[in-house]
Amino acid sequence: ICPQATAEIPRNVGHPLASARRLIELLGHQYPDHTLHVVGDAAYASQALRGLPDNITWTTRLRKNAALYRLAPARTGRRGRPRTKGNRLPQLAKLAVSMPWAAAEVTRYGTTTAVELAHRQCLWYTPFGPQVVQLVMVRELSHTGYDVALVSTDLRATAPEIVERYASRCRPLDTPVPR
């Protein structure tokens, strides 16, 4: 990253995620014709992510206690402020039981494995506000419930692409490093 771009970012101001967002927005501004895919763990999700530019997507692991909501209903035609979110969805464990699962092959950490995926669009209002996100739940073929829940602002990506993108964020400690 060029020193001139990083010099514009104030240090020790606010949450580290807010600083990271400003840096990513600078990159997005420098490359407006490219889509930047940012991936992080559950700690990298806060209100600092509201209103991301169109050319920046954010993929993160979902917290087990995350409050997910249906999409905002259509305007009723009555006076007053329209609703910004729909009804609350059940907890992730209950949601996993009611969602349809499909088998898929994904490449994670250097190996291709068969897993089951379930996905839907919803709102994770706490970090992303009214921005629609894609929820992807992953489980091994022999498991019930879910193993990992991911959320992404990239609505064009398929569920396997989101899983592979999240798995590419780092190498697990027990994976040998290529020489």
Residue ranges and their predicted role:
Residues 10, 39, 43, 165:
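Short, charged/polar micro-motifs that form catalytic or ligand-binding hotspots
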Residues 1-33, 76:
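RNase H-like nuclease fold core
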Residues 36-44, 58, 150, 170-179:
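Short, conserved catalytic/metal-binding motifs centered on acidic residues
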Residues 49-61:
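Short, surface-exposed basic-aromatic patches at helix termini and helix-loop junctions that form
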Residues 1-9, 59-172:
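An anionic, glycine-rich sequence signature occurring as long contiguous blocks
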Residues 19, 40-44, 52:
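Short, glycine/acidic-rich beta->alpha junctions
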Residues 32-34, 52-55, 143-146:
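Short, well-ordered loop/turn elements at secondary-structure boundaries
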Residues 45-49, 159:
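Short, well-ordered alpha-helical microsegments
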